[in-house]
Amino acid sequence: DFGRKTYNARSETVSEKPSYKHAWSKRHYALTLADAFYEPCYESGKAVRTKIRQANQEPMAIASIWDTWTEPETGELIVSFSMLTIDASNHPIMRRCHKPEDEKRTVVPLRPDLFDRWLNATPDTALALLNIDSIPELVFSE
């Protein structure tokens, strides 16, 4: 299913991939609002669905892109989005998620002081914002 494969977009290739390059080049930047997100944590040896929130318990805004496309069978105009991901191997919380042998990735919740910069960025500036330093403090939550 196409939609299932495109809910996350790798920041390293977002400008090149056919699914995303139009949205990226047109600067269709968005913020996806969430109270938390979930990732599998394998520290116990088994996959445990783990809730991740901001340490201050405030909702977060995840760096995303959006675009429109026409559904071929119905002609309906569809608005869709994808959250951007980065390497998380150096993030104190996110590097603990996913299988030990798997690549560590994370979506990019942005610090509030970066919202306007993200939404009004050039592609180069947007790419520069997609890094671990842009992420507010995160914690595992119940």
Ranges and model annotations:
Residues 1-142:
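A structured binding-face within diverse protein domains that lines the active/interaction site
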